[in-house]
Amino acid sequence: MLRSIFDFNQRSTKMVMISHKLDLILVFIIVIGGSIFRRVSANFTVPCNGRCGGLTLPYPFGFSNGCSIRFDCSAAEKPMIGDFSVQNVTENSIFVGLSHNCTRKIEDMNPLFGENFAPTSENSFLMENCNRTTDGCSIKQKFLENVLKLKSCDATGNISCFSLDSNSSSKNSAKFFSMKTLRNSSCSLLFSSIAFESVGVNAGIALEFERVRLGWWLKGGCESGTCAANTDCTDVETPHGYAGHRCSCLDGFHGDGYTNPCQRALPECRGSKLVWRHCRSNLITIVGGTVGGAFLLAALAFFFFCKRRRSTPLRSHLSAKRLLSEAAGNSSVAFFPYKEIEKATDGFSEKQKLGIGAYGTVYRGKLQNDEWVAIKRLRHRDSESLDQVMNEIKLLSSVSHPNLVRLLGCCIEQGDPVLVYEYMPNGTLSEHLQRDRGSGLPWTLRLTVATQTAKAIAYLHSSMNPPIYHRDIKSTNILLDYDFNSKVADFGLSRLGMTESSHISTAPQGTPGYLDPQYHQCFHLSDKSDVYSFGVVLAEIITGLKVVDFTRPHTEINLAALAVDKIGSGCIDEIIDPILDLDLDAWTLSSIHTVAELAFRCLAFHSDMRPTMTEVADELEQIRLSGWIPSMSLDSPAGSLRSSDRGSERSVKQSSIGSRRVVIPQKQPDCLASVEEISDSSPISVQDPWLSAQSSPSTNTLLGNIPR
């Protein structure tokens, strides 16, 4: 009995031991299985769906739970953040549309402040109902009406800019807005916003109206190790206080830097395109050139790169605020949306191109109101171009003269600033003188254009305070409207004169053949520099010749030198445009000679020997009114257009112009006959120096003390 009990106990003990072993094995299986399950789960996380309709976004953006930055896919298959449409995503920004709304509350902006994104300091919010003036700019309602095409808002509304000051010079620590910041703005309504960014290495600024720029990040610093291989990790100081980061592929690699590893871009010489000798030759050339130049430029390039990297963000921020303030403050100029400009020119089509100027290309365009305009697109994306467009806007909006081209508006939304002018259907004076358009202009019309142009330039010199010097007067900058009236254009090289001195030291700018020779040598700019350029235009009007023509004899390549030589030696008739010589009457021939004498004085080498533009305009007006009545048809041949009978019946010797009477002698074979000048009160002639002390008020020049 005892033995049986003992045996039973032994069996029970063995069973218990086996049971414990089974329990241990089960626990081991559960632990190991759980570990294996977790590892498997880690390798098979919920995927990120980056597709919305026909759009596919790269990770970390997407539309499902597996995406670190999740957007909504609307019924219209467009990415959304709440009620705001996502317009673009880049390696560091999310661009969201923010259309104008007169009643939008600040709290409605909550969806734009997420766990992984927020508006950056590269925005300027347009606020309404502000209790105090914001630190940013103040925008007039008319400006917003022009840019945003508003119709429903109260025109008396108080619109102010609200921006963050960029105090950091580091590219990687851009400041962010917060809801608390907006609530503390003392404004109750948020009307819209303007996003800006730097374009190009010299910090040109592009403004995007009705847009918000959001900076994005993933949680954790770069030490979290979420970036894939061949990436550059950027630490982000988030507005929430915790660390954030962004991953981006290195130069020469492509991918998203996270789930899609960055792979090196494939070279051209590969696969079916592999031609060993061709690739080997290219490789040797590339490697040799790279190695040879790299060591020479590396240190210098690195120095400038570091310097620009530290200064660009702050300069960009301040430039954008300055541009916005200046643009908004000048309510007399309309601001056109970039989309309207692009549509007006058919996407800046070659068919709409009118010509190429010193700083940009001019296109013909048709606005939404069916008005034809000339659109000048500046091509330089640098700080000089930005200053250039603001300078031209200020100049053109401050002048008002019937013979100066009128600025209708501008566009500063994109990197290329755009100016919009009134359209001139009859082209330029140069086109008509060179017969590129029409069959030539009659003398009476040429004289009218010259007179109107001189009056416009004289207005810039004498009626503006300080005076404005054009610096690029030429026949291609003299436009003709529907009635062939002159319109002086292109203030791209204009500079404001200084009242305390008669010259400005600056680098010579302008067009070869028109540039003041004294200015080119001495770097002194004055009103007389424009007088010289206009003298070249007068020579063009008389001769119909090109200003610089290498097909002419060597001594006659430059029209100014040719005109001075022929006029000074009494051979004016040799250079008169043949189309004017078909049937000249006495007054026409006399007036051509008188204008030639005026051109001769304008082309004097020394500036103090030239007349002022006011004197030039007065003399041309006297010539124009002296002997003819403008009754002509522009469709008639130039040679058949004469002066009036009153002018034709006069003898040349009796043709009085002001206080002068010009006697035109018979042309001698040696072409050395002098021009006899009979004057009631003035001893001045073509051969005598034109001294400013005799008739010009501008006597204070650098050459004033040179003995004559």
Curated annotation (Swiss-Prot):
PANTHER family: LEAF RUST 10 DISEASE-RESISTANCE LOCUS RECEPTOR-LIKE PROTEIN KINASE-LIKE 1.4, PROTEIN KINASE DOMAIN-CONTAINING PROTEIN. Its EC number is 2.7.11.-. Pfam families: Pkinase (PF00069). GO terms for molecular function: ATP binding; protein serine kinase activity; protein serine/threonine kinase activity. This is Wall-associated receptor kinase-like 14. ATP binds at L354, G355, I356, G357, A358, Y359, G360, T361, V362, K376. It is an enzyme of class 2 (transferase). Residues 692-708 have a biased composition (Polar residues). It comes from the Eukaryota. It catalyses: L-seryl-[protein] + ATP = O-phospho-L-seryl-[protein] + ADP + H(+); L-threonyl-[protein] + ATP = O-phospho-L-threonyl-[protein] + ADP + H(+). Residues 643-652 have a biased composition (Basic and acidic residues). SMART domains: S_TKc. Serine/threonine-protein kinase that may function as a signaling receptor of extracellular matrix component. Residues 307-708 are cytoplasmic. Glycans are attached at N43, N88, N101, N131, N158, N167, N184. The keyword Zinc does not apply. The lineage of its organism: Eukaryota, Viridiplantae, Streptophyta, Embryophyta, Tracheophyta. It is found in: Membrane. It comes from Arabidopsis thaliana. Its main location: membrane. Residues 43-285 are extracellular. Residues 1-42 form the signal peptide.
